[in-house]
């Protein structure tokens, strides 16, 4: 579903009418059969600028190959309520994370007031729709340099790693969700992992585990087939250069 027709095929309107008539059920019907290109996702995300719910739509930086990296922010950034931050597609060969983040941002930009407005009264929301557009286009796990961006949060050798740090410092999120995709046709469809680095503040770890449990319970109630992953902890899963571990160490409840 690439090319001029974009995410919605040839029916995509030139002007996005923000009539707020989409429901969550509508979103599932808009999921494409074929993967969109990085430029498709970028161009469609720019359309969100027309939504009055958007606080900021920022080109927060550029990928190794010069593609814009977009951060979408909703809400008034009231310090009295939590900020929830979604990050998608550090790994370019995990397309579902980008599509999910795009649909999430689209729902909050265009969704019905009955579904969206009560949530935005309780949280500030930020969505980093696509961290690794070069990897998405190449179908590769790493960025254009072949680097696994989810192992670059300590050294910050890559531009995308630096930009993720910049976004985090801009937002100061209460909760951070790092979105991935796992292959294989098994019985476990949804996997959730909490931070495991032992230097994380105990309160952040405890809150992350509560959130992990709540998410798994909600998944299993709605769809089933949810599971905790990376447990028990290993040396690899405790790596401080992994997104959920790194930003939990910096005080954000993380998954």
Predicted regions, residues:
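M14 metallocarboxypeptidase catalytic domain recognition
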Residues: 1-255
């Amino acid at each position: 579903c690439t090319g001029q027709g974009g995410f919605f095929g040839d029916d995509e309107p030139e002007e996005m009418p923000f009539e707020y008539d989409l429901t969550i059920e509508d979103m599932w019907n808009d999921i494409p059969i074929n993967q969109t290109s990085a430029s498709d996702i970028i161009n469609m995300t720019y359309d969100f600028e027309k939504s009055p719910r958007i606080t900021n739509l920022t080109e927060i930086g550029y990928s190794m190959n010069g593609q814009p990296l977009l951060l979408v922010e909703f809400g008034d950034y009231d310090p009295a309520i939590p900020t929830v931050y979604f990050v998608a597609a550090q790994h370019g060969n995990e397309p579902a994370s980008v599509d999910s983040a795009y649909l999430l941002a689209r729902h909050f930009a265009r969704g019905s007031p009955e579904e969206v407005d009560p949530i935005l009264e309780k949280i500030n929301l930020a969505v980093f729709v696509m961290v690794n557009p070069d990897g998405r286009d190449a179908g590769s796990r790493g960025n254009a340099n072949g680097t696994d961006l989810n192992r670059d949060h300590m050294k910050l050798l890559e531009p995308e790693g630096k930009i993720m740090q910049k976004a985090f410092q801009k937002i100061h999120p209460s909760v951070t969700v790092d979105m991935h995709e796992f292959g294989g046709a098994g019985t476990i469809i949804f996997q959730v992992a909490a931070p495991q680095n032992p230097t994380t503040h105990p309160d952040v770890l405890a809150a992350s585990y509560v959130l992990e449990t709540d998410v798994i319970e909600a998944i299993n109630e709605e769809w089933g087939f949810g599971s905790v992953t990376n447990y028990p902890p290993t040396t690899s899963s405790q790596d401080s250069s992994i997104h959920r571990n790194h930003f939990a160490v910096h005080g954000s409840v993380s998954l």
